[in-house]
From Swiss-Prot:
Its EC number is 2.7.11.22, 2.7.11.23. Plays a key role in the control of the eukaryotic cell cycle. Component of the kinase complex that phosphorylates the repetitive C-terminus of RNA polymerase II. The keyword Kinase applies. The gene is CDC2. The active site is at 127 (proton acceptor). The modification Phosphotyrosine is found at residue 15. This is Cell division control protein 2 homolog. One of its GO terms (biological process) is G1/S transition of mitotic cell cycle.
């Protein structure tokens, strides 16, 4: 750790404190993420070290670069490139963003690019949300942070500061207790983020797992064996769920054009195997007039 000098604490993420720091060898500003481990008495699990080491190989313009992993007996520090703006902060400080369909399209394209790259390397995110989509102010490049950390460390129910980890972007198969799930969970999250960029408010802001499910059901309709074959076999599915009818997405996201609505509906498909993939989404007609904003 002698190589890195902490400058200031910049935030508290899902896994621990994040510092702005200086790499004394290169004089570069970096982000230092201190991972707080659940079973601290047992030290750093070797599986976590292996998982994280694989992430150093990930190299893509829309992924936050992991430069280094430093671990001692009890804790692990991840050294990332430093970016001080995230999509949540940007949306909060810039409400007129919703009136810029070109920038929304560019950001969505970049998110999907990063997700498709990770999925092609068999890495899932599982916790995509506006707070871990970082923006480079100089280039307008958008980069995904924290990819792969869920597999290495699990997703806690609460952060170490006891904030509840958000459920707003969580796919219905996870909420319904599916043991096996895969890359479609990230596409669902991206769909939720897409709608939020357009509406300037979250699509499904649930405050508990059941509230989250019901917020989804009220808009997309309560799933059944017709709309989602196999749903009734998921551990937390109840036949007693209230039965809501699906709303027309055009009334839910009124400022989105028909191509955007078509893409959004394909990202928010209930049946995971029928959900569009990130790679397919990049080819969607919504992006045909895309100019990546530089």
């Amino acid at each position: 750790m002698e190589q890195y000098e902490k400058v200031e604490k910049i935030g508290e993420g899902t896994y621990g404190v994040v510092y702005k720091a200086l790499d004394k060898a290169t004089n570069e500003t970096i982000a230092l993420k201190k991972i707080r481990l659940e079973q601290e008495d047992e030290g750093v699990p070797s599986t976590a070290i292996r998982e994280i080491s694989l992430l150093k190989e990930m190299n893509h313009g829309n992924i936050v670069r992991l430069h280094d992993v430093v671990h001692s007996e009890k804790r692990i520090y991840l050294v990332f490139e430093y970016l001080d703006l995230d999509l949540k902060k940007f949306m909060d400080s810039c409400p007129e963003f919703a009136k810029n369909p070109t920038l929304i399209k560019s950001y969505l394209y970049q998110i999907l690019h990063g997700v498709a790259y990770c999925h092609s390397h068999r890495v899932l995110h599982r916790d995509l949300k506006p707070q871990n989509l970082l923006i480079d102010r100089r280039t307008n490049a958008l980069k995904l942070a924290d990819f792969g950390l869920a597999r290495a460390f699990g997703i806690p129910v609460r952060t170490f500061t006891h904030e509840v980890v958000t459920l707003w972007y969580r796919a219905p198969e996870i909420l319904l207790g599916a043991r096996q799930y895969s890359t479609p969970v990230d596409v669902w999250s991206v769909g939720c983020i897409f709608a939020e960029m357009v509406n300037q408010k979250p699509l499904f802001p649930g405050d508990s797992e059941i509230d989250e499910l019901f917020k989804i059901f009220r808009i997309l309709g309560t799933p059944n064996e017709q709309s989602w074959p196999g749903v009734s076999c998921l551990p937390d599915f109840k036949t007693a769920f209230p039965r809501w009818q699906a709303q027309d997405l055009a009334t839910v996201v009124p400022n989105l054009d028909p191509a955007g609505l078509d893409l959004l509906s394909k990202m928010l498909r209930y049946e995971p195997s029928k959900r569009i993939t990130a790679r397919q989404a990049l080819e969607h007609e919504y992006f045909k007039d895309l100019e990546v904003v530089q």
